[in-house]
Regions:
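Bacterial N-terminal signal peptides that target proteins for export
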Residues: 1-7
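Low-complexity, acidic/polar, glycine-enriched regions of mature
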Residues: 19-195
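Hydrophobic h-region of N-terminal signal peptides that target proteins for export
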Residues: 9-19
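A generic signature of intrinsically disordered, low-complexity regions enriched in glycine/proline
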Residues: 7-9, 64
Length: 195
């Protein structure tokens, strides 16, 4: 026999499941996407970072689901080398005037207990979107005593081929095209009182 309250219970169940998802605003002061790139086919490794990032993370540890959306200001690239910053920002490489942002959007696809371990998503860089999988190397949430809010932090990493995004400068000189991307991120829980 069909229960007359079944539709209501279903709606309440969906609402409850949705409410279990927690939203975090990416903290730009504690989020530092960084990367490693090859120089002349193994002679050395150049490391850089991006200084400005924004985004939102939603996670439901009980349901083991969640999403990530991180936007990077490509004009803030920093190798601690002014001339190199200028060159990488130029039309010959990232062309930050034409493509001022890079974005990673993905979903948590693997959890161990309550901790996410893998993100399957898409990276948009230089106007090109390609799939990139990130491994979450560490994840922790705590009640920040200064902010008086819950903060979650993670270190995620993955590799991609920059030539796939149309950024293949140096390939003719033997530069390897693989890039190691690391995203060190902290997110502040959004509450009713949050701005």
């Amino acid at each position: 026999m069909t229960h007359k309250y079944a539709p209501l219970l279903l709606i309440l169940g969906i609402t409850s499941a949705t409410a279990a998802s927690t939203t975090y605003n990416v903290d730009p002061d504690h989020t530092h996407p960084s990367f490693e790139v090859d120089h002349f086919g193994g002679v050395s490794i150049w490391r850089g970072t991006f200084k400005k990032t924004s985004g939102i993370v939603q996670i439901d540890t009980a349901a083991k689901t969640g999403t990530v959306d991180v936007v990077i200001d490509t004009a803030t690239i920093d190798f601690a080398h002014d001339k190199l910053n200028e060159h990488v920002s130029s039309p010959e490489m990232l062309d930050v005037a034409k493509y001022p942002t890079a974005e990673y959007k993905g979903k948590f696809v693997e959890f161990v207990d309550a901790s996410p371990k893998t993100i399957s998503g898409d990276l948009t860089l230089h106007g090109v979107t390609k799939p990139v999988t990130l491994t979450i190397n560490s994840f922790k949430c705590f009640q920040n005593p200064m902010l008086k809010k819950q903060v979650c932090g993670a270190d995620a990493s993955g590799t991609f081929n920059r030539a796939d995004f149309g950024v293949n400068y140096g390939q003719q000189y033997g530069f390897k095209q693989d890039v190691l991307l690391r995203i060190q991120v902290e997110g502040i829980k959004v509450t009713a009182a949050s701005p």
